Amino acid sequence: MPSERCLSIQEMLTGQRLCHSESHNDSVLAALNQQRSDGILCDITLIAEEQKFHAHKAVLAACSDYFRAMFSLCMVESGADEVNLHGVTSLGLKQALEFAYTGQILLEPGVIQDVLAAGSHLQLLELLNLCSHYLIQELNSFNYLDLYRLADLFNLTLLEKAVIDFLVKHLSELLKSRPEEVLTLPYCLLQEVLKSDRLTSLSEEQIWQLAVRWLEHNCHYQYMDELLQYIRFGLMDVDTLHTVALSHPLVQASETATALVNEALEYHQSIYAQPVWQTRRTKPRFQSDTLYIIGGKKREVCKVKELRYFNPVDQENALIAAIANWSELAPMPVGRSHHCVAVMGDFLFVAGGEVEHASGRTCAVRTACRYDPRSNSWAEIAPMKNCREHFVLGAMEEYLYAVGGRNELRQVLPTVERYCPKKNKWTFVQSFDRSLSCHAGYVADGLLWISGGVTNTAQYQNRLMVYEPNQNKWISRSPMLQRRVYHSMAAVQRKLYVLGGNDLDYNNDRILVRHIDSYNIDTDQWTRCNFNLLTGQNESGVAVHNGRIYLVGGYSIWTNEPLACIQVLDVSREGKEEVFYGPTLPFASNGIAACFLPAPYFTCPNLQTLQVPHHRIGTI
C-alpha cells in the first residue's frame, strides 16, 4: 500500500488569531522592578540628597517627559551614568520611582508634599493625578485653604476645582464657624466662588455683605470693581438695592459699582421685559434643573392651580414613595387645564386653557401669567387676543407664539398671535391655512414646528408645518406617518419625536397610538422608531432635559381615566434608546403642562444634581 503523506502543521491549521497575555505587562514590569532592587542591568543612577537610586533609562523615559528629554536629546546627562537631581528630596524620588515601576504608591500625610514636589519636577503626570485624588478625599473645613495653596503651587487643577466646589457648598457653614478665615481667602479663590451658579446657600444680599467684608479686610480695594461684577444685584429686591447697596460708601465711591446697582434698579422697573433682559447678574443661582408640573384636571373635574417641582433630595425612598418628592410652590392665580407653558429667560409663562367658573361651567380663556422663580410669585401679563385651549405655545428669541386651539365657544381657530414682553402686548401674525386644535408643537432649530391636530370639520391631520418668524410664513414639510391628535412633540438634537395621541380606525372609532415616530430636520424624513410607549397617553404635558423626553400625565381612552404616570424616553444614545416609567405624579391629571426650570434654591438650598428615579423596564 502506498504510504500516506504526512501533513505539515501549516497545512493542518487555518486562519489567524490575535492572542493576548493578560499577565505579560505586569510580569515584565515586575521583573524590571526586581532588577532595580537588585541593582542589575540598570543603566542610570539617580542621586537626590546624596542618596543613590538605580533605574532603567527606558522605564523612566516611558513615564516622564522630563526624563525622555534628558536621555534622548543632546544633553549632558544623556550619556552620564549618574545624574544629580536638584529640587527633589530623596524621599520624594524613592516614592516616585516606586510608582514608576509598580503603578502603585502609598500616600500619607508624611510623604505627600515630597511626592508632589518630585512628581511636579519630574513631570510624572499620572502620579500628580493620584495625589490630587488623595487630597480631594482628605478635603475638609480645616484644611481647604492649605490644599488650595498646594493646588496652586503644583498646578493641580482637579484639586483646585474640588476646593472651589467645597467652598461653594459649605460657605454658609464656614461663615458661621470660621468667619475670619473666610476673609483671608485669596482673591482668585473668592472670585471663582462668587461667580458660581451653584452658590445657593446664601442670599444675594449675604453674598454682597461677604464681598464688602472681604474688601474691607486688609483693604483689598484694588479688587473692588472686578469683584462686584460677580454680585447679582438683579436678584436683590428694590428696597435692598436702595438701603443696602446704593447708599453704601463703597458703591458711592465707585462709578462701576454705582452703574451695576443702577442697572439692577432699571431691570426691576421694566417688569414685563425682564425675561428678554436677562444677564449673568440677573440669572438665578441654582444647583440643577428639575421637572415642574403646572395645572391640570383631576378626576373630580376640578381645575388645578398648583405649581409643583420634583425634589430628589430624598434619594433613599425616591423609588418607593416618589409622590413624597413633589414639593409645592406658589399656585397660579386660577386653576386651569389644557393650557400651555413656555420658558423664556428662566421665567415660566402660562397662557390660555380651560377654567371652571362659579356656575360649574368650563370654557377657554385668554388670560396669561408669568412665574418668577427668584421670588416664587406670579404676575398677570396682557391677555391673548383669542381665548384658547388645546393649542400650542412656543418661545422663539424674544417672543411667545400662540397657535390655533379652541375658543370659548369651542370653535376651532386658524389664528396665530405673538407676545412681545418689552411691550406686554399680543399681535396677530400669519394664520394657518385652516383651523386647527389638539395639535402638538415644539421649538427647534429656531423655528416653531406644528404636527397633527383636528380641523373645524373634525378631520384628523398628519401634516407637519413649520413657522419661519423672519419671513412670517408657514411652510409645509413631509407629513407624519399617521394622523395624530391629542399627542405630544419634542426635539432632541436635530430630531423631532411625536409621542402618544390617538387616531381613527376604519369605523371612525378612536384608537390609541403607542408608536413613536422621529423626524430628521436635515433630511425632511420620518422614521418609525423600533421602540414604543409602554402605555398610550393623550393630553399629556411634555418636557425635555439632557436627551430625555418626559411625557407627563394625560388621559387613557382605554380606561377613560386621567393618568398619574410619567414615561421617559431616553434618546441620548443612538441605538440604545430606552423607554421607562419615571416618578408618579401626586395625582392623576390630564391637560397638565410640564417644563424644566432651575430648582428653587430658596426652598431647598442643598438640592443636588437632578436624578429622576425610574422603574426601568429594560433596554428596547
Curated annotation (Swiss-Prot):
Spell out the InterPro entries in the cross-references.
BACK (IPR011705), Beta-prop_ATRN-MKLN-like (IPR056737), BTB-kelch_protein (IPR017096), BTB/POZ_dom (IPR000210), BTB_POZ_KLHL32 (IPR030570), Kelch-typ_b-propeller (IPR015915), Kelch_1 (IPR006652), KLHL32_BACK (IPR047028)
Q: Which residues form the BTB domain?
A: 42-109
Question: Kelch repeats: which residues?
Answer: 290-346, 347-398, 399-446, 447-494, 496-547, 549-599
At the top level, the lineage of the source is Eukaryota
> Membrane-spanning regions, if any?
none
Q: Which UniProt keywords apply?
A: Kelch repeat, Repeat
Which SMART domains does the record match to this protein? BACK, BTB, Kelch
Recorded hits in Pfam families, A to Z, give:
BACK (PF07707), Beta-prop_ATRN-LZTR1 (PF24981), BTB (PF00651)
> PANTHER family of this UniProt entry?
KELCH-LIKE PROTEIN 32, LD33804P
Name of the featured protein: Kelch-like protein 32
The UniProt gene name for this protein comes to KLHL32
